[in-house]
From Swiss-Prot:
EC annotation from Swiss-Prot or TrEMBL: 4.2.1.9
Active site: S468 (proton acceptor)
Protein residues bound to [2Fe-2S] cluster: C119, C191
Gene symbol of the encoding locus: ilvD
Protein name: Dihydroxy-acid dehydratase
Length: 554
């Protein structure tokens, strides 16, 4: 066993003495040592209950003959960090989580790992760690929050963000906003739509790193506890068979994940995270691959924010296995890949079926013949930009309008709330990329303000930052190269006409190439906003969004 390095032989008597100081017995030290990474904390609703998940995982490990060793991981709540300096830290914590899990796992020679995440950056951070460490591993997430019905509307966190915009526009009273605040998040779990957390939890299942049900079983259901116990039992089997992440996270597994991503209409953040996870196993996923898969995989689901269904509805309709079963009917998935069940994808979905075709469309009756995410290119985004096509109003799929340029999210929010944005405008928020932010903040506050004020069918927003999975509307992010790196978005001026053509994958500023080159020569990078601490180091090392915003060894 790998753990023999810390527990076998006379030379390891001091090591065993330290284990015994914590109450471990000789019998426990004879068994496989399984690291259990628990990201439970009291600031993230999706993580407040993870102690119960961890206890179930540890029970499963013991039942199967292993010895669990629990340790903690950090986790930021993107919702609470939203709209202020705190959001600069969110994406950056993905790397901190991966690095800290790597350090703990390799420092203590665990035989296997169980990762317990739930929310936005914790899931990909732990998947990156699993891939990098490459000992047998399984992910068991905390599960989605329920959506509560209020006044004939299914609420979620995004409902509250949009309510603030509606209040600013005089369309809701303060009391009505308060009622949303009281009802929108009824308990523990990852926010209830197909936002980033649930997107990544579902894709974990598709990649083969989580058990069937990992993405959709609600947080408060007893089935989630049973799933955690099964994950604990399964990791011991994976250790015995030495099935590692490198056996599971193959190029075909990532193609499956991208296909289901398109079918579900996942968060655009998945386009940041899947390349970063792939990078850990030496693979490259670029925007061209994403576009190719999007062009042939139909969109089968319109979950919030694209529609009114939530993840609990997807669960009731058959979950991720049912979606995969539909895609398999047109040979859009690789079915002979090994997963953490010890079985193949084909075996995992063999008995799956759609129970509600209102939630999961038939492969022959999709919402659209192409996927939920589109990659755009043009002179405004030579290296690409990303939009959640499934959440864009039909009238905004093709749009031209004058640029309204802001050099920070804060300035844009102020202008939107003060009624300074007009129908037809294209709001550009720049210097919010991985380097420029630094940290590539999510723009949920401005997009929700636009939607809440009733402008989501008239106003587009373009940024080198990124968007929450809860964002809807013509919200185009990840513009690469970013402004801080001298990308063309840095030289756009107020009044320049911006041309958006999502069906044809185009994003341009309508000025001559000679003028673009002239402005680029005159441009000078502004001083970095943050130079100290972790974000200062992060800004120096982070790559462009089109590469997954990974840290590069320079």
């Amino acid at each position: 066993m790998r753990s023999d390095a810390v527990k076998k032989g006379i030379e390891r008597a001091p090591h065993r003495a330290l284990f015994k100081a914590m109450g471990y017995t000789d019998e426990e030290l004879e068994r496989p040592l399984i690291g259990v990474v628990n990201s439970r904390n009291e600031i993230v609703p999706g993580h407040i209950h993870l102690d119960k998940i961890a206890e179930a995982v540890k029970a499963g490990i013991r039942m199967a003959g292993g010895t669990p060793v629990e340790f903690g991981a950090i986790g930021v709540c993107d919702g609470i960090a939203m709209g202020h300096t705190g959001m600069k830290y969110s994406l950056a914590t993905r790397e901190l989580i991966a690095d800290s899990c790597e350090a703990m796992a390799l420092a203590h020679s665990f035989d296997g790992m169980v990762f317990i995440p739930n929310c936005d950056k914790i899931v990909p951070g732990m998947l990156m760690a699993a891939a990098r460490i490459n000992v047998p591993a399984i992910v068991v997430s905390g599960g989605p929050m329920l959506s509560l019905r209020h006044n004939d509307k299914n609420l979620d966190l995004n409902s509250v963000f949009e309510a603030v915009g509606a209040y600013k526009a005089g369309k809701m009273t303060e009391k009505e906003v308060w009622e949303y605040e009281e009802k929108a998040c009824p308990g523990c779990g990852s926010c209830s739509g197909m936002f980033t957390a649930n997107s990544m939890n579902c894709l974990t299942e598709v990649l083969g790193m989580g058990l069937p049900g990992n993405g959709t079983v609600p947080a408060v259901y007893a089935e989630r506890i049973r799933l955690a116990k099964k994950a604990g039992m399964k990791i011991v089997e994976l250790v015995e068979k030495d099935i590692k992440p490198s056996d599971i996270l193959t190029p075909k597994a990532f193609e499956n994940a991208l296909a289901v991503d398109m079918a579900l209409g996942c968060s655009t953040n998945s386009v940041l995270h899947l390349p970063a996870i792939a990078n850990e196993v030496g693979m490259e996923i670029n925007l061209d691959i994403i576009n190719e898969i999007s062009s042939k995989v139909p969109n089968l689901c319109k979950l919030a924010p694209a529609g009114h269904h939530h993840v609990q509805d997807l669960y009731a309709a058959g979950g991720i296995p049912a979606v995969m079963k539909e895609l398999s009917k047109k040979n859009l998935l690789h079915l002979d890949l090994i997963t953490v069940t010890g079985k193949t994808v084909r075996e995992n979905i063999e008995n799956a079926k759609v129970r509600d075709y209102e939630v999961i469309r038939s492969i022959d009756n999709p919402y659209s013949p192409t996927g939920g995410i589109a990659v755009l290119r043009g002179n405004l985004a030579p290296d690409g930009a990303v939009v959640k096509r499934s959440a864009v109003a039909p009238e905004m799929l093709v749009h031209k309008g004058p640029a309204r340029v802001f050099d920070s999210e804060d300035a844009a929010i102020e202008a939107i709330y003060n009624g300074k944005i007009n129908k037809g405008d294209v709001v550009i928020i720049r210097y919010e990329g991985p380097k420029g932010g630094p940290g590539m903040r999510e723009m949920l506050s401005p997009t929700s303000a636009i939607a809440g004020m009733g402008l989501d069918k008239d106003v587009a927003l373009i940024t080198d930052g990124r968007f929450s999975g809860a964002t809807r509307g013509a919200s185009i992010g990840h513009v690469s190269p970013e402004a801080m790196a001298g990308g063309p978005i840095a030289i756009v001026r107020d009044g320049d006409i911006i041309s958006i053509d999502i069906p044809n994958g185009k994003l341009d500023v309508e000025i001559p190439d000679s003028e673009i080159q002239k402005r680029l020569k005159e441009w000078k990078a502004p001083a970095p906003k943050i130079t100290k601490g972790y974000l200062g180091r992060y800004a120096k090392l982070v790559s462009s969004a089109n590469k997954g915003a990974i840290l590069e060894n320079k």
